[in-house]
UniProtKB/Swiss-Prot annotation:
Activity versus pH, per record: Optimum pH is 7.75.
The protein's assembly and partners: Component of the 1,3-beta-glucan synthase (GS) complex composed of a catalytic subunit FKS1 and a regulatory subunit RHO1.
Gene symbol of the encoding locus: FKS1
Start and end residues of each stretch annotated as Disordered: 1-136
Biased composition regions of type Low complexity, renumbered to the chain: 12-23
Record keywords: Cell membrane, Cell wall biogenesis/degradation, Glycosyltransferase, Membrane, Transferase, Transmembrane, Transmembrane helix
Subcellular location: Cell membrane
Enzyme Commission number, as recorded: 2.4.1.34
Biased composition (Pro residues): 1-11
Bias (Gly residues) ranges: 51-64
Name assigned to this protein: 1,3-beta-glucan synthase component FKS1
Compositionally biased region (Polar residues): 91-101
GO CC entries: 1,3-beta-D-glucan synthase complex; perinuclear endoplasmic reticulum; plasma membrane
Organism of origin: Cryptococcus neoformans var. grubii serotype A (strain H99 / ATCC 208821 / CBS 10515 / FGSC 9487)
Length: 1799
């Protein structure tokens, strides 16, 4: 195709006359302000000619009106010499006015003046020279009585583009966008109604966001009253103040009332001409189409549109002669806003954009900017550069002042997302009230001994009433704390804080009422009649207060933000609290669910938790320990040890009180969900015979739109085509062999009547009722069986009826893509990943899909034989020997091809790609929509087939046209223009395979001059786009953006830039690792029917009566099921699949019914107009909106959109398969949830939802994560309680009981701790149940969908594969990631793996990844558990041993081939290297690097200095706020250290052989000794390195490493010496020594954290200081002025590092010892592999094949390092065991301890 240079356009066209036919050219008022504007004649001969243009626009750089925008900018690429464009030039440029937009005739070569952006003009493949394609918008033709022709619509867009300076490509894109929407609607309603409803959805209807915003921001006052009386936008009261001066106050008030304003609005909308309606929609879409990041701010966009609309109707605009330059709108309106948003997060350093170190509460984000436009006060803040307020300018002139707005002065934070745990208090205050207050009521009533008069165990009646009644006091305290915290999250303006202040005053009064009587009763009158009355009244007041606070949303107390009638609350109600109402039955179900949950919870908690705690409280309260004494504290601490223990037990009981609510929620939610599945017929327990026998009838009734067809065609004929297409599609995917296909197809057979043929149905439908016959039709347990069963089962449910294909709405599938695999390369398939991988990908896939591989090979062989025969192969080959044939087949069965010709290798690549998580799989799966639409169109319209006779090409073209019209597929390939050669080839392959696939990508043009910014474009290509000489395709549209659109975490920005290319009414958002199937795609019309827009009322949405038909809340999101296709790929894949199954299906089913489904994950369908007018399909602030999709769900829910769930449609979805990648995903979800807790959406939902929906929201979303925190917290608190109880049990004489349960006589001085031991057992059972309840939903889901056998088998496989260990570990990861995020921040997108986890990961990598989140905690808990086991052993503790060991070893347990002996030893060598490297030269993976990185979340980094390679090793981590550091890093560890030291001091407070032992001094010496020793060692080595280093470094590069090795060896030795000293001082009393170690660890941890938090300044990004310390070379390190201060800082760092090094060294060897034990079991590695991969031992992965040299090398390494490993482990064991053996020989006593008992 050649593109001639465009000729100059005509200089000035017809002049524009300001005709009186335009009702809006005399006034600047909105059309809906006058009661009855005159009817606009849209086809009037004197209507404005939008093709006007004029000369006189200054070219860029030559001054003139627009010079400020263009002098420093490169040209847009438009035509500068002569103003605007007319339709004829626009049409000829785009080449698609008269013909199909994307597919002009093949002889078209670009008309005159072809667009500079070079929009593509692909040829219509295969079209004949004389063939003109059908009309692209068949429902919008002159025959259909359309209100405006395509040409008139085009004119409108050209006119708007000329008036506002929209880009040509953007205008063309919007034209196509708008026409497809009109065509989509007009295909099922009249064209007039289509335009009317479209205008109602975008601009004026009941649910249009623009209309809602218009009234919320009180613009009706601004517009109706006019600029004279109301110069600024003020509140109603401001106008009312001047109301007395008006002549008719009543009329003014009437004008101002909301009802009269909405009535005026409706009248004006009803009277508006269709021309104006179209113009408004077109203008809105043009504003939206170039808005870029402003699309995330829907109300800001509404404001821009309002100003543009006002300006358009002004005489100034209508009389304008010349067209404004192209791109003016982008530069004057969008770019300043974009720059403001960009500069919030980034700053320019050395010409590069660097992320600012700001947390969310300092960043004015999209939501803050958007919220400014909600309120009149916000809009009135907008000022120009000369400080004029924009609202003081007449509405019609505001748009032209946008370039002069100073946005930096306008915006402020509207909600402060501070990192704080108080968000949990504010957002979920009702949860805390409900639990803590009720816990108080239960416990206070059952603990009379605590508040009884001294000497008595029973309290007086008034005291009992009053103390129990303090539950209300507690509830009020929680509410006061929540209110005070709320003050810190919202800006303190009077409007915000007035209702908070009112609430606070009221709460203080209630506090006095619920707490005051207790003071009187407790201190003045415990027994009187008045006291009793006061106590009872107090109790009932408390109950009322508790119920009120637990049920009423705090946003509705004292200034109702949700339902208040005041106009000042309207914006809040409109945008945050327009919750869609539930129907009667769902509401009843919602209340019933929570009544059952809390009914069971409170009953069970009272009897199981509270009553069981009664006896321990009774015996522990008042218990004082006798005969104990401490050297420094006397008996002040030790006598109160039972009180400390009781306090910790209280916290434990309260934690369990929270946990069992979630347990009951899981149980009842599962019951409800299963009941729903039976109600809608989605269960295997529906009669099996019924499912298959009736399948043909159901296909006919539910899949086909066959209202009037039965007369002409038998249902069997139609159904057979659909069924055969499904079966053949499975055959093509190699799921079925040819034999299976023959049995499953409908066959044509000879009829009884001569010359006629009839159809025979497959026996499959009938024989399904006969047991045992299923296996004949498809392989047992195969993918084909699963798909056919689900298809049959899904059609038993009630589903919306389909409408004919040509009437169905158009929809788009959108897939964001970054760097996911497009197609696997041959190298990836047939080569191992690295030396730690034992299997190629193809081998692994063949073992996972043996039947499919077999079918594929058979298929390939047939192909090869045909090819051979065609090429003249031997026709008698079949007579040759069978052996030779078998040998010939080997290559087919091993790699899938024999000839390396591309067509054969490509087949193998595609086969593997369709079974991995690739984009090709996604595209090929979702392109089935196109096949389904063609199939349905052909089946339902047999006359179309007859029309084309035998011309299959023309028939295919007609089917293609219909599919293309109804379905679009856009992949947003963010990196497309930066793809490497292989990626580009793969993308090109996709486009050739699927020419209708569209790819949106970012195209970058370098700056024209130095120091300028690159220009970035949003471009679109498809498989029809012309290929240019450079190999790239010519874009169809290329729209300039204001700057780089990727400002956030990437995904939402990627979706947002491509969203302008979607088409139609609905969007399906898909991830690049999903799949779809033909039989599911056949249900697309039923699925779209769920949006309830197929049968639209014929009334006008604006008519006085008709608007009621449109009052229903629209469906915003339709959720769909996901089948996780990685479910059988070993235990981890199955766990990931199980979680998705339970959350995505089981929970979603019940949540959507009771109106609590928020989660919009993929593959959900979206109402595109609804979502795009409300901020788009996801939110995009970096970090805060990490889980971008759920925010779209919350946004839609809060603004009145319904969220439904579809049970009968499901897509495939891939999940992460490796331990690390699954936990990366969970970390991402956990940190994302932490960010959600900070967000304003949670604030609005938590403080405004009614109680039943609030509970559904809480337990369905954040409750799960908070429950994980509480589960792990309960383990920690319980361990602490048991340590205290262990010290009591160890040191005190415990009373013994008889078998009858009575205390035995003659036990003076004993302590009754038996009730406490019973409580311990009950607690362990509770924690055990809470952990294991996680498996119930999966089991029940499997039971209902696949039957008892499959459910039991799956559960057994999980338990045998140690899945509970993984569950414990993942719970800890969830907890760590949330708490870490709430404390330190740093949430970021973690790219999770999409491959198969077959590679063994080295110990050091796993340790460094999981030490912080879990292993350290596990190791500390292990030491606690050892002490507990030694002092309070009960068999129930075995469960805790499994749990805690799981926390330590889970990462290694799920590591492939962890227990192969040779690999283990070689890995040990790698571990020792990891511990020691990075001190002489930089290394990317070293212990010192890991240590630096783990402390940077506290210290933060210094500013980035470009150029040093080691800087790349660390990512940006913002420094944590000091409050977070104070609580998390200083106060927390100090408290723990104090508690453990108290425990140690207690056991040392009893005299042994008459001698009191000095506990405190001993702990101080053992804890501080190693630190002092390390300091001395460091100073010595520092002096050596400074004096010798500069000389010796020139001789050896190992000097630094040697010094570091000496220091680290000394540190480990010092640690062991001091441990041995403790062991000796305790005289080898194991439990005492273990408790001593616990206390020492806690003290050292406390010291190190304190040093890091207080003494360490920010880290350098590079590691020069570390290497300078060891090598002694401090110059030339790039330290600059820091060279003098760094040695002192580095001394503190090295002191900490030495302590941590020795701790890590010992901890790692303990872990390695635990992992060594299973290796003594023969064949354990094989058993372990079976457990991980679920492959039978005979299918297992072969060991790798090594060369002779490699084998010899490995043997040497194994021998050398194996010996070293045994020696080190032997030393550790000897240090513990040898003293025990010789202690009796030595005969030591306390008196033989040296230093005369000082230590």
């Amino acid at each position: 195709m050649s593109y001639p240079n465009p000729p100059p356009p005509p200089k000035g066209s017809a002049s524009f006359s300001s005709s009186s036919s335009d009702p809006f050219n005399q006034t600047n008022q909105l059309p809906y302000d006058s009661q009855f504007p005159p009817q606009h004649a849209f086809a009037h001969p004197s209507a404005p000619n939008p093709g006007a243009g004029g000369a006189g626009v200054a070219p860029p750089g030559q001054g003139g009106q627009y010079a400020p925008y263009y002098d420093n900018e490169p040209e847009m690429g438009g035509r500068w010499e002569g103003g605007g464009m007319g339709r004829e030039t626009w049409a000829s440029e785009s080449g698609w006015s008269q013909n199909e937009p994307n597919y002009p005739p093949s002889d078209y070569h670009g008309g005159p003046g072809y667009l500079p952006s070079r929009a593509s003009t692909p040829t219509f493949e295969g079209s004949n020279a004389g063939h003109r394609p059908r009309d692209p918008y068949p429902a919008w033709t002159v025959d259909a009585n359309i209100p405006l022709s395509k040409e008139e619509i085009e004119d409108v867009l050209i006119d708007l583009a000329n008036k506002f300076g929209f880009q040509k490509d953007s205008s063309r894109n919007v034209y196509d966008f708008l026409m497809i929407q009109l065509d989509s609607r007009a295909s099922r309603m009249s064209p007039n109604q289509a335009l009317l409803t479209l205008h109602a959805d975008y601009i004026g209807g009941e649910h249009a966001n623009y209309r809602k915003w218009y009234f919320a921001a009180q613009l009706d006052l601004d517009d109706a009253i006019g600029a004279v009386q109301n110069p600024g936008l003020n509140r109603v009261r401001s106008v009312a103040r001047r109301g007395g001066k008006t002549k008719n106050p009543l009329a003014t008030a009437q004008e101002k009332s909301l009802e009269s304003a909405t009535s005026r609005w409706r009248t004006a909308m009803n009277n508006m001409s269709q021309y104006d309606r179209l113009r408004q929609v077109a203008l809105y879409l043009l504003c939206w189409g170039e808005a870029a990041q402003v699309r995330f701010m829907p109300e800001c966009l509404c404001f821009i549109f309002k100003c543009a609309d006002d300006y358009y109707r002004s005489p100034e605009c209508q009389n304008r002669q010349e067209a404004v330059p192209e791109g003016l709108y982008l530069r004057a309106v969008i770019k300043p806003l974009y720059r403001f948003l960009r500069d919030q997060g980034y700053e320019v350093v050395d010409g590069k954009f660097l992320r600012r170190e700001r947390d969310h509460d300092k960043v004015i984000g999209y939501d803050d900017v958007n919220q400014l436009f909600w309120y009149p006060e916000g809009i009135s803040r907008i000022t120009l550069n000369d400080n004029t307020r924009l609202v003081d300018i007449p509405p019609a002139q505001r748009f032209m002042k946008f370039d002069r707005i100073d946005w930096n002065k306008v915006f402020f934070k509207t909600y402060l997302e501070k990192r704080s745990f108080f968000h949990l208090l504010v957002n979920f205050n009702r949860i805390w009230v409900l639990h803590i207050s009720v816990f108080w009521f239960f416990t206070a009533y059952n603990a009379p001994s605590i508040y009884a008069p001294s000497g008595s165990t029973t309290a007086t009646t008034p005291m009992a009433w009053s103390m129990t009644g303090l539950g209300g006091f507690v509830a009020t305290l929680i509410m006061i704390a929540a209110t005070l915290a709320e003050f810190s999250y919202i800006p303190t303006t009077w409007n915000n804080t007035s209702h908070l202040t009112r609430r606070l005053i009221f709460l203080l009064i209630i506090l006095a009422i619920t707490g005051g009587p207790s003071i009187y009763i407790a201190f003045f009158n415990q027994t009187g009649h008045v006291a009793l009355i006061l106590g009872i009244v107090q109790f009932f007041c408390s109950v009322v207060a508790t119920i009120a606070f637990a049920t009423l949303p705090s946003g509705r107390m004292f200034g109702d933000r949700v339902a208040g009638k005041s106009r000042k609350y309207l914006a809040n109600q409109t945008f945050t609290a327009s919750y869609p109402a539930l129907g009667f039955y769902p509401r009843v179900a919602s209340f019933l669910l929570w009544f059952l949950v809390f009914g069971c919870k409170f009953t069970e908690s009272y009897f199981f938790l509270t009553l069981s705690f009664r006896d321990p409280m009774k015996v522990m309260n008042g218990m004082k320990v006798q005969n104990c004494h401490d050297k420094y504290f006397g008996n002040g601490l030790c006598t109160n040890q039972p009180a400390f223990a009781l306090a910790v037990m209280f916290v434990m009981d309260l934690t369990l009180f929270f946990l069992d609510t979630f347990l009951w929620y899981v149980i009842w939610n599962t019951v409800f969900s299963i009941a729903r599945s039976f109600a809608i017929g989605m269960s295997i327990w529906t009669p099996w015979k019924d499912i298959f026998a009736r399948l043909p009838k159901r296909i006919y009734a539910k899949i086909l739109a066959t209202d009037d067809m039965e007369v002409k065609y038998k249902p069997k004929v139609l159904v057979s085509q659909v069924w055969n297409a499904v079966i053949i599609s499975m055959y093509r995917e190699h799921l079925l062999s040819i034999e299976h296909v023959q049995k499953l197809l409908y066959h044509q057979i000879q009829s009884d009547q001569p010359g006629k043929r009839t159809l025979r149905a497959p026996a499959f439908f009938i024989s399904q009722s006969e047991k045992g016959s299923k296996a004949e039709f498809f392989p047992k347990g195969s993918e084909a069986e699963r798909r056919i069963c689900f298809f049959a089962q899904s059609l038993t449910t009630s589903i919306p009826a389909p409408i004919p294909v040509d009437a169905m709405p158009t929809f788009t599938v959108l897939v964001p893509h970054y760097s996911e695999k497009i197609l696997l390369s041959l190298r990836e398939i047939i080569r191992e990943e690295d030396q730690n991988t034992r299997v190629t990908l193809l081998e692994y896939l063949k073992q996972l899909h043996p039947v499919e591989w077999d079918n594929f090979v058979r298929d390939t062989k047939i192909l090869a034989e045909e090819s051979d025969a065609f090429n003249g192969g031997n026709p008698f080959a079949s007579d040759e020997k069978e052996e030779a044939k078998k040998a010939d087949d080997i290559p087919f069965y091993t790699i899938g091809f024999k000839s390396a010709a591309p067509e054969y290798t490509l087949r193998t690549r595609i086969w593997a790609s369709l079974r991995a998580q690739t984009l090709y799989r996604t595209v090929s799966g979702f392109m089935n929509y196109s096949k389904a639409i063609k199939l349905l169109y052909r089946v339902e319209n047999p006359e179309v087939v007859q029309l084309f006779g035998g011309n299959t090409d023309q028939l295919e073209r007609e089917l293609e046209r219909m599919a293309r019209r109804k379905f679009k597929f856009v992949v947003s390939m963010q990196r497309y223009s930066k793809f490497n050669k292989e990626e580009h080839e793969n993308a090109e392959f996709l486009l050739r395979a699927y020419p209708d696939l569209q790819i949106a990508y970012l195209d970058e043009e370098p700056p024209r001059k130095d120091g300028g910014e690159s220009r970035i474009f949003s471009a679109l290509i498809d498989g029809h786009s012309e290929i240019m000489p450079n190999g790239r395709r010519r874009p169809k549209f290329r729209i300039e953006l204001p700057g780089n659109p990727i400002l956030g975490d990437g995904k939402s920005d990627n979706q947002n830039h491509a969203i302008v290319f979607y088409r139609g009414e609905y969007l399906q958002l898909i991830d690049a690792n999903q799949d779809n199937y033909l039989e599911e795609c056949l249900k697309i019309r039923n699925v779209l029917g769920e949006f309830e827009e197929f049968k639209v009322s014929t009334q006008s949405p604006y008519a006085a009566q008709g608007h009621a038909d449109f009052a229903k809340f629209p469906v915003a999101i339709l959720g769909a099921r996901e089948y996780i296709f990685s479910e059988n790929i070993g235990i981890l894949g199955d766990i990931a699949a199980g979680k998705e199954q339970t959350f995505g299906t089981l929970a979603a089913r019940s949540l959507s019914y009771i109106g609590g489904k928020l989660h919009y994950g993929h593959p959900d369908f979206l109402n595109a107009i609804y979502m795009n007018t409300r901020g788009g399909v996801s939110k995009a602030q970096k970090g805060l909106h990490l889980n971008e999709d759920i925010f779209a769900g919350m946004l839609a829910f809060g603004r009145g959109g319904r969220i439904k769930h579809s049970e009968y449609y499901q897509c495939g979805k891939g999940r992460d398969l490796g331990f690390g990648t699954i936990l990366n995903f969970q970390t991402k979800i956990g940190t994302g949830m932490g960010e959600q807790m900070l967000s304003r959406e949670y604030y609005y939902l938590g403080t405004q939802l009614p109680i039943d929906r609030f509970l559904t929201f809480y337990y369905g979303h954040p409750g799960f994560h908070i429950n994980n925190i509480l589960v792990m917290m309960s383990v920690q608190v319980f361990m602490l309680a048991l340590v205290f109880l262990g010290t009591l049990n160890k040191q005190l004489t415990v009373c013994r009981y008889s078998s009858g349960g009575d205390i035995l006589p003659g036990q003076s001085g004993c302590y009754n701790l038996v009730p406490v031991f019973k409580w311990i057992k009950r607690c362990i059972i509770s924690i055990f149940i809470v952990f294991w309840i996680a498996f119930v939903p999966l089991f029940v889901q499997e039971l209902t969908e696949r039957g008892t056998g499959r459910a039991i088998l799956r559960l057994c496989k999980h338990f045998l594969s140690l899945s509970p260990v993984f569950e414990v570990f993942s719970t800890q990861i969830y907890m760590h990631s949330i708490l870490n995020d709430l404390t330190f921040g740093g949430a970021r997108y973690i790219a999770t793996g999409r491959g198969f986890a077959t590679t063994r990961i080295s110990f050091s990598i796993l340790y460094s990844r999981f030490a912080g989140p879990s292993i350290y905690l596990g190791m500390r808990t292990l030491v606690l558990l050892l002490f507990i086991t030694l002092t309070v052993w009960v068999p129930h503790l075995i469960y805790f041993w499994i749990t805690v060991v799981g926390l330590c070893v889970a990462p290694f347990l799920f590591n492939p081939h962890q227990f192969a002996i040779a690999d283990f030893i070689i890995d040990y060598r790698e571990f020792l290297r990891w511990m020691s490297r990075g001190n002489s030269r930089t290394h990317a993976n070293s212990w010192v690097g890991y240590c630096r990185l783990s402390r940077t979340r506290v210290t933060g980094f210094k500013r980035k200095r470009l150029g040093l390679p080691s800087e790349k090793l660390s990512s940006d981590v913002p420094r944590a706020p000091w409050k977070a550091i104070l609580i998390g890093e200083i106060i927390g560890p100090i408290c723990l250290a104090i508690l453990f030291v108290i425990c140690y001091l207690f056991i040392k407070s009893f005299a042994v052989d008459g001698q009191i032992q000095p506990g405190l001094v001993r702990i101080a010496i053992i804890a501080l000794g190693p630190i002092v020793w390390n300091m001395a060692l460091l100073i010595t080595l520092f002096l050596i390195s400074v004096f010798l280093g500069p000389c010796l470094n020139s001789y050896t590069h190992q000097f630094g490493a040697t010094m570091a090795a000496l220091a680290h060896f000394g540190a480990v030795a010092g640690m062991l010496v001091f441990f041995e000293l403790l062991w000796f001082l305790e005289l080898w009393n194991t439990s005492h020594a273990v408790l001593g170690i616990i206390a020492v660890i806690s003290v050292q941890r406390c010291i190190f954290k304190f040093l890091i938090a207080v003494f360490l300044s920010r880290e350098f990004k590079h590691d020069e200081t570390n290497r300078a310390w060891w090598t002694g070379v401090w110059f030339n390190r790039g330290l600059g002025s820091h060279a003098l201060s760094q040695p002192a800082r580095e001394f503190v760092v090295k002191t900490i590092e030495m302590g941590l090094y020795s701790a890590d060294f010992i901890a790692c060897h303990l872990l390695l010892a635990l992992l060594t034990i299973p290796m003594f079991i023969p064949y354990f590695d094989r058993v372990h592999a079976t457990m991980l991969f679920w492959l039978a031992p005979n299918q297992q992965i072969r060991p790798p094949i090594y060369s002779f040299r490699q084998r010899s090398q490995r043997r040497k390494i194994v021998f050398k390092y194996g010996l070293l490993y045994l020696i080190i482990q032997g030393i550790f064991i000897a240090l513990i065991v040898v003293p025990i053996i010789f202690k009796d020989v030595a005969g030591l006593t306390p008196k033989s301890v040296p230093f005369n008992g000082i230590i």
